[in-house]
Amino acid sequence: MSEIIQDLSLEDVLGDRFGRYSKYIIQERALPDVRDGLKPVQRRILYAMYSSGNTHDKNFRKSAKTVGDVIGQYHPHGDSSVYEAMVRLSQDWKLRHVLIEMHGNNGSIDNDPPAAMRYTEAKLSLLAEELLRDINKETVSFIPNYDDTTLEPMVLPSRFPNLLVNGSTGISAGYATDIPPHNLAEVIQATLKYIDNPDITVNQLMKYIKGPDFPTGGIIQGIDGIKKAYESGKGRIIVRSKVEEETLRNGRKQLIITEIPYEVNKSSLVKRIDELRADKKVDGIVEVRDETDRTGLRIAIELKKDVNSESIKNYLYKNSDLQISYNFNMVAISDGRPKLMGIRQIIDSYLNHQIEVVANRTKFELDNAEKRMHIVEGLIKALSILDKVIELIRSSKNKRDAKENLIEVYEFTEEQAEAIVMLQLYRLTNTDIVALEGEHKELEALIKQLRHILDNHDALLNVIKEELNEIKKKFKSERLSLIEAEIEEIKIDKEVMVPSEEVILSMTRHGYIKRTSIRSFNASGVEDIGLKDGDSLLKHQEVNTQDTVLVFTNKGRYLFIPVHKLADIRWKELGQHVSQIVPIEEDEVVINVFNEKDFNTDAFYVFATQNGMIKKSTVPLFKTTRFNKPLIATKVKENDDLISVMRFEKDQLITVITNKGMSLTYNTSELSDTGLRAAGVKSINLKAEDFVVMTEGVSENDTILMATQRGSLKRISFKILQVAKRAQRGITLLKELKKNPHRIVAAHVVTGEHSQYTLYSKSNEEHGLINDIHKSEQYTNGSFIVDTDDFGEVIDMYIS
């Protein structure tokens, strides 16, 4: 064999060879493909496990066998690099959703090495199989392996956006990549929105993808950094540990760390904090303990008495990996080249891949369906002339002769003739003839559907959306990482992080609050709300997750609760008591609840108390940044209670009704705007031992429904009310009796929205229709509805 010797300069040879090497490690080793989010070794591991039947529904198999398969067929490198990649795919502190399930020691968050491959066992996770689904339907291209003995996929079908879900990290020649993991449900929702609107902005996408979602949890800060990374591919965020404070029996406090930043070595973190203690870099730490066990991660930092725990925590954030900065560098292989990509480009590349995958699969299924249709048509034709076919076959010399005769005499095709001669005798029954005709109809429908998908781009996109929704429904999980953005520090509107969604807000009279999806509400209906015995619905309305709920109590206080912080609970289930969200006193009860979309409004609230005080305050006064404690809405004096809170867009008439049957109607224009801590002015001039039972807005078309303790209901029209001035005594609405006089225990303004009433005693309740109560004159006591001897004395009434 003759040798060819080239005379080349060392500079040219080194440049050329290093260029080839760089291209190889960039494309074939260190960087993931944007379409399936996998590096070549990861793809080969998953494909080797799939093709050998090592799937989630089978038994675990020795890891060494998989490593051998990968090295022998696809990846001619050392076994350690393959095993390390395989182990990483099984580590739930590295991947948001593991792609391999592993039995045995697969390492730890302390960076302990895994057991040798001969000891551990593994199989594909259920989600990993979604990356490989339909790979046998010619959905992706295959190339020869390194020795041309078999084929391997260039990319996996990847039925979910794995690059964003599990992220990636790697270093190659001249390139590095750091893509954080995200929440699967959020990523899929953003992809669906992108399909619906390819011009969607990054800001709009961030309503669905709130930010990274690390498998180790933690707290993410820096929404500007997230937005910048999603726009350009590069950005910086802060990731800090979740730290809580506990008090020990001896009065000391300790900081408890339950979540640490992504890819931080826990044992190194504990060691670093202990070094800071030992070196007396920080004064006040007694001991650092790693209390992690099978129940979860836990690091305890015991503090000296009377030290400022907040200062120590801040010091540790600054001087240890209790807080780190994470730098986005979203580089991936796209069209065979490394590219720095924003989130829109990543989703777009993934979507184009899915369009190709679904189109290829549809073509494959269409081809198979058409081939089968051709066979079925031949079988049906043969069965229609069965006797002649049998006679022809019997007269033939052999199988080949029979096929040729069928083709020549009856014009069957080669494929149809083959199917006919292979037909078994038992298939000639009437049942199988009917089955073939049924299969023919099904194939016709399937072929029509598949052709529609191929001919109609929107139909193809709908298939992608349906399959993404299925995966979202099957594999969605709660977000692990909390995203915080303090307005003063980050300078960004927090609303960007809250997905805009219309929901149903509900509040019960006993203080149970929840938000419910409109779908759950519509499926159940108002009447099927989950309630405790004796409780009833106070209010429900459609709100947005970006709105704020103001909950007012009888103590004159209000709770400021962003809607998105309310628990998302099904309509038929019991809500969350407001005291679990914001602590309130035991004898504090909810009076009313209102939803605010924008506090920059001219609307105002009117507050009325039992002892006849009233106050007006504008809505902007109620905006706050404090969510963790009740705030003052109005000053309520001792031995008094707030009984009514109303919200008006402009001045209007209100009616006051008292226990002894007095009524005063006047306009809110008589009230001056006051601050939140003011007690207000006199609403009505009360008689001795009288008190207010109702203060509500009223208009000309309304009626008033009143209930007395003796079981009587009285309904009057608006015209009986006499508009007067504030602080007067008003008019009498009851006929005075010397013996056992009627006293009004409850009253409500009836509008067109109300149709039913409910009367309550201590042990009974009575329901009825408001329209059944006839309107009365001014000086009457109404009509008896219940017998108090049986029902008990009436103590309250609600309308709905």
From Swiss-Prot:
Site (Transition state stabilizer) residue list: 118
Topology with respect to the bilayer: Peripheral membrane protein
GO cellular component: chromosome; cytoplasm; DNA topoisomerase type II (double strand cut, ATP-hydrolyzing) complex; extrinsic component of plasma membrane
Keyword field: Antibiotic resistance, Cell membrane, DNA-binding, Isomerase, Membrane, Topoisomerase
PROSITE patterns the record matches: TOPO_IIA
Subcellular location(s) per record: Cell membrane
Pfam families for this protein: DNA_gyraseA_C, DNA_topoisoIV
GO terms for biological process, alphabetical: chromosome segregation; DNA topological change; response to antibiotic
Topo IIA-type catalytic domain ranges (all copies): 31-495
Claim: Ligase is one of the keywords in the record: no
Principal location listed in the UniProt entry: membrane
Catalytic residues (UniProt): 119
Residues the record marks as site: Interaction with DNA: 39, 75, 77, 88, 94
CDD domains per record: TOP4c
Alphabetical list of NCBIfam families matching this protein: parC_Gpos, PRK05561.1
Record family assignment: Belongs to the type II topoisomerase GyrA/ParC subunit family. ParC type 2 subfamily.
HAMAP family reported in the protein's UniProt record: ParC_type2
PANTHER family in UniProt: DNA GYRASE/TOPOISOMERASE SUBUNIT A (PTHR43493), DNA TOPOISOMERASE 4 SUBUNIT A (PTHR43493:SF9)
Assembly behavior: Heterotetramer composed of ParC and ParE.
Name of protein: DNA topoisomerase 4 subunit A
Taxonomic lineage: Bacteria, Bacillati, Bacillota, Bacilli, Bacillales
